Amino acid sequence: MDSQRNLLVIALLFVSFMIWQAWEQDKNPQPQAQQTTQTTTTAAGSAADQGVPASGQGKLISVKTDVLDLTINTRGGDVEQALLPAYPKELNSTQPFQLLETSPQFIYQAQSGLTGRDGPDNPANGPRPLYNVEKDAYVLAEGQNELQVPMTYTDAAGNTFTKTFVLKRGDYAVNVNYNVQNAGEKPLEISSFGQLKQSITLPPHLDTGSSNFALHTFRGAAYSTPDEKYEKYKFDTIADNENLNISSKGGWVAMLQQYFATAWIPHNDGTNNFYTANLGNGIVAIGYKSQPVLVQPGQTGAMNSTLWVGPEIQDKMAAVAPHLDLTVDYGWLWFISQPLFKLLKWIHSFVGNWGFSIIIITFIVRGIMYPLTKAQYTSMAKMRMLQPKIQAMRERLGDDKQRISQEMMALYKAEKVNPLGGCFPLLIQMPIFLALYYMLMGSVELRQAPFALWIHDLSAQDPYYILPILMGVTMFFIQKMSPTTVTDPMQQKIMTFMPVIFTVFFLWFPSGLVLYYIVSNLVTIIQQQLIYRGLEKRGLHSREKKKS
């Protein structure tokens, strides 16, 4: 086993990963066709069963803090639009990123209200409540840390329902508090609900990369319970009416996309019904409904929940609800990606640049792996030293493959050489490489993070393809500096074109990942020379015997 064969192993592993990724449906679920009829099969006992209608006509009010710009419909009190001023829509754009949207092309809303027998959002009791508000615009003032938006509704029986949105400075968690005053003579049976609904198919202005060669993160629904910390639920599964219907004490429901999330976190001592529903017209929903509570005559009842609407900032999300930070989807290598991100974030706290942080973490990773790298090159050198004996063995035994295999194994054992010793370090490096990819694609902190010169977004591909070309050049130098025993002309041609093939692959990769690979290759060149000097002293390597 030599260096060039190891490069072939990397290529095969890389291609296998690409095939596997394309096969893994939940990373990029296919959009469902728009439905023209209302689907009636929904989760039993859910708010959707109650038939919570669209918000209908109401007044739109504006609610602004330093990090949120919300539009709330007074008909039902749903959040119909959410802008994030701290996150530009695109690089160098003055327009904020829009997370929630209500338009003819796309629906993504955070609905909530009070259902149950006497709830104002129960269709049996009439249209959804039309709340009264004191003003049309609420703004968090300078020096103010909290903004409250009270909305009141009084039904025909004189019962008063108050829905208050509470927003805090610098916070993407919005508390939604309900206050029910029973003015009648009979108990009121009330349940609260929170629901996220979204169009399955993205419109062109939001579909920024479904046809690109690059891989994509999960877009869909998710939920958490004490028994299941984090479970994803694909939109197409909901569209097929394979709906969620479970009871949970605690937990949350959410909708996810790259870098951003919305989630409802109910706050009550009882159990909640978590459900999904196909609402028809190409729209799906995930939500919760609480157990009914009784508000006695002349008494006041309270219910509370929290809406997360914003970027997937792990430490802040973890403080809002247990396991909410798991919505940062690092894929099946999360156990590597999470520690890598924590280390990267710690380094960034000192250097202040994510690109330099990636360079430093590359040195750290390669430093930790140096003993394995040294063992790899030593094993390869020993294998090269055995080539004359192996060649003589092949000439002596001819076409007797079984005898050749047996004697080769005996030779390896006698010489204390592991024929797979050169592959093992590469197998260790591949998960780290892929984990770093998921970290770059899933961490909002790296979204639009600049490095230097022409690299203004480490999570996006190099616009001028300079980094992929540099990566190919470094791979070419590694290849030329590595001894080889390959004599087959076809294998030699494959190895010659390997840097070119990798360069083409890396054209669409995040520039931060390509930067990691360039630095890793440069470290490999340095380590290679240091190891070769040591092997020369042991008689296991000779520069004069190197073949191109």
UniProtKB/Swiss-Prot annotation:
Signal peptide: none annotated. GO terms for molecular function: membrane insertase activity. The keyword Cell inner membrane applies. The chain crosses the membrane at residues 6-26, 350-370, 420-440, 458-478, 499-519. Gene3D superfamilies: 2.70.98.90. Residues 30-50 have a biased composition (Low complexity). InterPro entries: Membr_insert_YidC, Membr_insert_YidC_N, YidC/ALB3/OXA1/COX18, YidC/Oxa/ALB_C, YidC_ALB_C, YidC_periplasmic_sf. It is found in: Cell inner membrane. Its main location: membrane. Residues 28-55 are annotated as: Disordered. GO terms for cellular component: plasma membrane. It is a multi-pass membrane protein. One of its GO terms (biological process) is protein insertion into membrane. Keywords: Cell inner membrane, Cell membrane, Chaperone, Membrane, Protein transport, Transmembrane, Transmembrane helix, Transport. PANTHER family: CYTOCHROME C OXIDASE ASSEMBLY PROTEIN COX18, MITOCHONDRIAL, OXA1. Interacts with the Sec translocase complex via SecD. Specifically interacts with transmembrane segments of nascent integral membrane proteins during membrane integration. Required for the insertion and/or proper folding and/or complex formation of integral membrane proteins into the membrane. Involved in integration of membrane proteins that insert both dependently and independently of the Sec translocase complex, as well as at least some lipoproteins. Aids folding of multispanning membrane proteins. Belongs to the OXA1/ALB3/YidC family. Type 1 subfamily. This is Membrane protein insertase YidC. It comes from Shigella flexneri. The lineage of its organism: Bacteria, Pseudomonadati, Pseudomonadota, Gammaproteobacteria, Enterobacterales. The gene is yidC.
